């Protein structure tokens, strides 16, 4: 089971609030629930990200966090390799995940349980979230959702942008694909069928749609006030 990760967190996408919680804070809470113990937060906008990380939060209090700064621009694979824990043999797989997106906890649990380098993709985005995921990059296996489990030997042999590396890895089968569309619909804890969801931080015009998706994921029927605050 993977227990370390690198979180890619930049303002403004990582600080978009949905149901009163930033996408970064929501991700940190989800990662703790998925068994992640240590996270390095890599940011080109460290000041606002540091301010968000400094907020007290019991829901991710057990998660050890380290903030690192990077140059502005697209994330490069070399930047990920530089952050790899010193003993790469002890950490064969590292989760790399963007904080500017929202993920169904079931998807992240499934991803961190993989035993080989794997990228989360979606070959058939559901109609409800098509507007929210339209900006996500396309690959030969479907939409690139963002999270990936990377192996040190693979990552250190690459050069260039992270997104291009993931796309090429999928195209050449050096990285496996975990397809959102192939995941079970039944949500055991909710006792209902619900397609597993993901989406980048929404624009202002799509914010209400994103919040409806989140609220629907935690209950049946119309949303109530307690659900709003715990979404």
What residue ranges belong to the model's regions?
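Left-handed beta-helix
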Residues: 1, 43-46, 101-103, 168-231
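N-terminal glycine-rich phosphate-binding loop and ensuing alpha1 helix
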Residues: 1-50, 63
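Structural motif
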Residues: 8-11, 41-46, 70-71, 96-101, ...
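Short acidic, S/G/P-rich loop/turn micro-motifs used as interaction or catalytic elements
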Residues: 11-15, 30, 46-48, 73, ...
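Conserved beta-strand scaffold positions in the cores of enzyme catalytic domains, especially
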Residues: 15, 64-69, 74, 94, ...
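Surface-exposed alpha-helical segments enriched in charged/polar residues
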Residues: 29-33, 82-85, 109, 113
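Short phosphate-binding loop-to-helix
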Residues: 48-104
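Conserved core of the sugar-phosphate nucleotidyltransferase
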Residues: 53, 89-91, 101-181
